[in-house]
Amino acid sequence: DMYGDITCGDMGLNTQNYGWFYTDELGQSYTRRAYLWSYYYDIIRLTNKCVNALQAQVGKEGLTEVELINAHADEFYYYAEVLAMRGWAYANLQKWFCLTPEQIATQGYTMADYMSIPVYTEEATEQDTIIGAPLSSAEDVYRRAEEDLKSAIYYFDILEKEGMTRTIKQEM
């Protein structure tokens, strides 16, 4: 995403105000850090809502997976896109707010016992929004992101094999 490009060390600027984004990286309590956290969790909240709605809509027909996909091609496109977005959001949250797997190992932790960020897979209730979910292990976060991304690829591949592709940019 663009924020990552702007805050990297080799971002080229065409004016003399180099370093204007320096204060963004001073600490996790800085406003833009809070914005990043909220931005990705808003995406996750909305994708969870979509995933649950789509599962409820197409999951009751007793069809094989391919028959179900053929019967609901548009819904499965949305489902695949939403899963990809949720996986992307978790991967970015992990990148921005947690240690890398190498850093975790260097500090003597395993991926299973290093607590990183909360994982939400259901729609958040009012209580969840007030209190928040407990932290999940880095292993759980990476697993969630990987499962979502692999599922998205899987559904896109099936849709493509069945001849259901989107070639217009606005449909992506």
What are these regions (language model features)?
Residues 166-168:
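Long, repeat-rich segments with strong aromatic
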Residues 170-172:
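Aromatic-residue-lined binding/catalytic grooves and analogous aromatic/hydrophobic interfacial grooves
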Residues 7:
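Transition-metal
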Residues 1-3:
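Acidic, glycine-rich segments characteristic of secretory precursors and extracytoplasmic regions
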Residues 148:
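Aromatic-glycine hotspot motif
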Residues 13-99, 132, 136-139, 151-163:
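Conserved, well-structured interaction surfaces
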Residues 61-68, 96-144:
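Short coil/linker segments at helix-helix boundaries
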